[in-house]
Each structure stands twice: as structure tokens, then as C-alpha cells.
Amino acid sequence: MSRAVRPYLVLATQRSGSTLLVESLRATGCAGEPQEFFQYLPSTGMAPQPREWFAGVDDDTILQLLDPLDPGTPDTATPVAWREHVRTSGRTPNGVWGGKLMWNQTALLQQRAAQLPDRSGDGLRAAIRDVIGNEPVFVHVHRPDVVSQAVSFWRAVQTQVWRGHPDPKRDSQAVYHAGAIAHIIRNLRDQENGWRAWFAEEGIDPIDIAYPVLWRNLTAIVASVLDAIGQDPKLAPAPMLERQANQRSDEWVDRYRAEAPRLGLPT
């Protein structure tokens, strides 16, 4: 007897390892086309830009390292057209839908869902259900080492490369900045706390995956997600993506850990 096919939504924070998971699921050809559908701002049609991540920061030594804002092109799609795009773009021919949602994107998702007809309720859980079509399997990816996560984020903000390896020249121009890393740590901790509070409030018990476990057991974890969404676990591929961190990232992590206590910065 065939099992029920279910959609899934990966819940995470930036640089937590979620891309490693969703790209491995995508590679199966049977687990949807998981994308970060809910990151695009209607005002620009773009994901948040470096300066938007540092909104409210007035430290010029940070701001001078960030690219200027791009005005983009406003997204004028109707709410129903937007929902249809999300549904069709995330689905493989077998009917499985996959996607990824960061905590900082939840307010925008709720705002866009509020304009849809025939709502099933209020709040984030109803918004997810009304956009996707039904309740997904929730998969929570998190990274216990938030300092390494923040360093990875800070490098990506400067190079503007969020997956794969950046251009060596631009990567060499990325600059260590303890204050910027601290700002990102606070942001990431707030986001992760948001997810955990929401799980408790809604009584949700997601598939919980820590990055170190994911990295060491990728094929087995992908198999477990496939099983949860009604697909053959044997389709889980061998590891694909390479680790983006390198010796320079490790040096920045060590330097920040050494400096943070003296500077009163979070770790």
C-alpha cells in the first residue's frame, strides 16, 4: 500500500546548514523543488540586502563594508497569483512540495497570506497551511555553534555568495569585524528563540536536525525526511555540497571567541 504524500517545510535560520539539506532532498527528484520562497520583499522583489540586515546600526566601520542598496523591482503579483507560483514552483511531478522558511520571514509570510481568500485561521500556522495547501511536515535545522554560524553569515554578506565558493578576489577583500559578528549573533539567537517559542506554543514536534549531525549523517537524515513525506528512503543521495568554511573562517571564529569576553560581546 502506498503511503500518503506530504509536503514539507524546512524551518531554520541563515547559515544553519538548511541549504545542505534542501539541495540533497532536491537531488532525489521526488522531494519537491525546495526554495526559500518567502524571503522576497514586495517593495524590491529581492531578498533582504546587506544593509537591511544591519538596519539601525550606525557604526560606519561596519556600514562601509556593505554594498549599497539596490532599488530592485516591486513585486506586483496578486496574492492568489503569488500563492500559485509558490505551489507550482515547489512541487515535483509526483505532487510533493518542498520549501524553506526562516524566522525573519514569518511576518512577511503572514502579511501576504492575510490577503488570500478563504483563510483557515489567523497566525503563522494557518498562513503556512493556506499558502502550501495543507499542513506540512516541519523540519527544524539549527546550528548550535552560533559563532561559526555568524562568521559564515558575515562573510556571505560581504561576498554576496550564499552557496558555493565566492570569487577568490572578492573573498580576499572580506574583513573581520567583531561588532558585525556580534550583531549577527544577536539576530540569529533571536530567530532561533522565535522558532522554539512557536513550537512550544503550537505543540509542534518537528523533525529536529542539528548541523553537526546533519553534516556527518547526511544520507541517513535525508532518508528519514523522505520516509516522513511518503517517499522511498533508498533514494537519499550521497553527500553533494562541500563545506564552505575554510581556514580563514576558522581563524575568525577563534579570534572572535578570544575577543568577545574582553569586549562584552555575545558568544
UniProtKB/Swiss-Prot annotation:
Role according to the record: Catalyzes the sulfuryl group transfer from 3'-phosphoadenosine-5'-phosphosulfate (PAPS) to trehalose, leading to trehalose-2-sulfate (T2S). The sulfation of trehalose is the first step in the biosynthesis of sulfolipid-1 (SL-1), a major cell wall glycolipid and the most abundant sulfated metabolite found in Mycobacterium tuberculosis, that is a potential virulence factor thought to mediate host-pathogen interactions.
Gene: stf0
Alphabetically ordered keywords of this record: Carbohydrate metabolism, Transferase
Active site feature: 36
Name of the protein in its database record: Trehalose 2-sulfotransferase
UniProt xrefs under Gene3D superfamilies: P-loop containing nucleotide triphosphate hydrolases (3.40.50.300)
GO cellular component, one term: peptidoglycan-based cell wall
Annotated EC: 2.8.2.37
Pathway(s) where this gene product acts: Glycolipid metabolism
Protein species of origin: Mycobacterium tuberculosis (strain ATCC 25618 / H37Rv)
Subunit organization: Homodimer.
Record has 4Fe-4S as a keyword: no
Stored InterPro entries: P-loop_NTPase (IPR027417), Stf0 (IPR015124), Sulfotransferase_Stf0_dom (IPR024628)
Mutant lacking the gene: phenotype: Loss of T2S and SL-1 formation. Unsulfated acylated precursors of SL-1 are not detected, which indicates that Stf0 acts before lipid addition to trehalose.
